[in-house]
């Protein structure tokens, strides 16, 4: 199954989700994108520190969301606003969900950009908990 995680810049939330998912869902094809990503930009220092702290696979550098990405089996956005933007750009898509919506949770993933390391760690924990639920949804 091909899963793409989407946030704004593809430097904080979606790369964390990509790394966590690569660890928890090793048989799936995992990627991340940003709706406003600068192609090739490095992920945030704090996100990279968390990836190393938890010994996760490193994500790819920032990549923008493109129409070809709609071919993924599942596209999981960090917020309703990201989902709405994809719909406004490409029309309604049956494979696009917010991450929390997909696993039956209510918490959106706020952007930690500019926050302290603790804020990034809280974001990591939220994303980990939600991505972990994907495992059970696919069993």
Curated annotation (Swiss-Prot):
Presence of the UniProt keyword Transmembrane in the record: no
Catalytic function, reaction form: O-phospho-L-tyrosyl-[protein] + H2O = L-tyrosyl-[protein] + phosphate
Active-site residues, Swiss-Prot/TrEMBL: 7, 13, 111
Domain of life: Bacteria
Name of the featured protein: Low molecular weight protein-tyrosine-phosphatase PtpB
Hydrolase recorded as keyword: yes
Keywords, ordered alphabetically: Hydrolase, Protein phosphatase
Function: Dephosphorylates the phosphotyrosine-containing proteins.
Pfam families: LMWPc (PF01451)
EC number: 3.1.3.48
Record family assignment: Belongs to the low molecular weight phosphotyrosine protein phosphatase family.
Residues forming coiled coils: none
Enzyme class (EC, first level): hydrolase
Stored InterPro entries: LMW_PTPase (IPR050438), Ptyr_pPase (IPR023485), Ptyr_pPase_sf (IPR036196), Tyr_phospatase_low_mol_wt (IPR017867)
